Amino acid sequence: MNCTKGGGFPLLFCAVICLMAQQGACNVVLIANNTTLSFDDVEATFTPEVKDSGVNGAIYAVEPLDACSPLRKKAANGPVSPFALVIRGGCQFDDKVRNAQNAGFKAVIVYDDEDSGVLVSMAGSSSGIYIYAVFLSKASGEVLKKYSGQSDVEVWILPVYENSAWSIMAISFTSLLAMAAVLATCFFVRRHQIRRDRGRIPVTREFHGMSSQLVKAMPSLIFTKVQEDNSTSSSCAICLEDYSFGEKLRVLPCRHKFHATCVDMWLTSWKTFCPVCKRDASAGTSKPPASESTPLLSSVIHLSAESTALSSFRSTVAVSPPRPIRRHPSSQSTSRAYSISSAPRNYNLQRYYTNSPYISTSRSNVDLANMSSQWSHTPHQASMHSLRSGHLSLPINIRYTIPHVSRSDYGSASLGLSHDSCSHHGSPSYYHSSLGQQRSYLMHRTESGPSLSTMVLQSPQ
């Protein structure tokens, strides 16, 4: 049943109303001596409508009674219009009316040949027909037939407007009920089809967010005042509203803060990462969050700088040839290494990184040559002799730690690399400083053992 194709229903509805309105449009009234009879009739659809004042005449039964052939008797001319009484059957309604019209009758009354009690609306071709025609029941036709040919009997065909109005109202109400029933049927059928189709298609739900239990487990706080300097410390990045005193804030693993209601809706309904830094909110806090003070690429740059500085230092020590170094007259063999233990630890390392080669903060073994074995077996005088003659061939195994700053007796800052030694003889240390011109310092052995301690300044040539 296709309910969408109902374009012809309004036309059919109007046609039914017109036909049913004409069914109660007229009444046949018989007036005889002290007798008045009224019969219900239905007007034909192919003949002219009865005038408002109605028409009257005398009734005559024709021969043949079915009027399917030309009538044997013509209508008599007189002051009263002749009406032909015809029985149903044998031919079409328009043929009966046309034969009666040709015989001179002014109206045709057709009665049913069966006692069905149903009045029909006669249909046919209206070509060349200008007289009136109505349809009666079989009982009404038998009564009229008794008064056929009597000149003192008068028959009226009158329109009945009251019956027509009530019929239109009844038909309209019935038609509206039928239309409502059809529409309701279509609605329920369509609804049933949609439910059936939904049952056939597998339901696939796409999960976008986190579970509410996991979101509620994240830490939260009550806002009192701005305590940090970042993009989410004073306002919510989701609703763009400033925090108010007493509001509940949710803290994500990346340390960004939001309104609890805003970020809970974001994490459970949309995405599982931070709206600011795009970090997964379900992951743990293994590293500090990226902010203005800790850029995203800081760790990468730090690691690459360490590896570059270490490789550069190794290549420099291995390739550079020995240089002659003269001992400064003011330095003594009994001098001690400059103390660097009192240097502050919170020194700004950025200045050192930009002005001097970077040395890895991790412990590294730098092999300068096989220096330790010769250094331990060679006397102090031989060591100084080799240093004066320009041969720095004694190898040292040094472990470097984080560089720090000390102040020498000359007033200039020196950057030192301390050495962690496992032997009881001490540890060699290497120091470097700048006094405005090319200088180099030599750390050489003291009484404490095989360590380079005294810094010897080479005079410029």
Swiss-Prot record:
Membrane-related topology note: Single-pass type I membrane protein
Chain ranges on the Lumenal side, renumbered to this chain: 27-167
Disulfide cross-links: 68-91
Zinc finger (RING-type): 236-278
GO cellular component, one term: protein storage vacuole membrane
GO MF entry, a single one: zinc ion binding
GO terms under biological process: protein transport; ubiquitin-dependent protein catabolic process
Cytoplasmic-facing ranges: 189-461
Main location: membrane
Entry-linked SMART domains: RING (SM00184)
Statement: the UniProt record of this protein carries the keyword Zinc: yes
Start and end residues of each PA domain: 67-147
UniProt keyword annotations, A-Z: Disulfide bond, Glycoprotein, Membrane, Metal-binding, Protein transport, Signal, Transmembrane, Transmembrane helix, Transport, Vacuole, Zinc, Zinc-finger
Superkingdom per UniProt: Eukaryota
Xref: Gene3D superfamilies: 3.50.30.30, Zinc/RING finger domain, C3HC4 (zinc finger)
Pfam families according to UniProt: PA, zf-RING_2
Region (Disordered): 319-339
Its job: Involved in the trafficking of vacuolar proteins. May function as a sorting receptor for protein trafficking to the protein storage vacuole (PSV).
Protein name per the record: Receptor homology region, transmembrane domain- and RING domain-containing protein 2
Organism: Oryza sativa subsp. japonica (Rice)
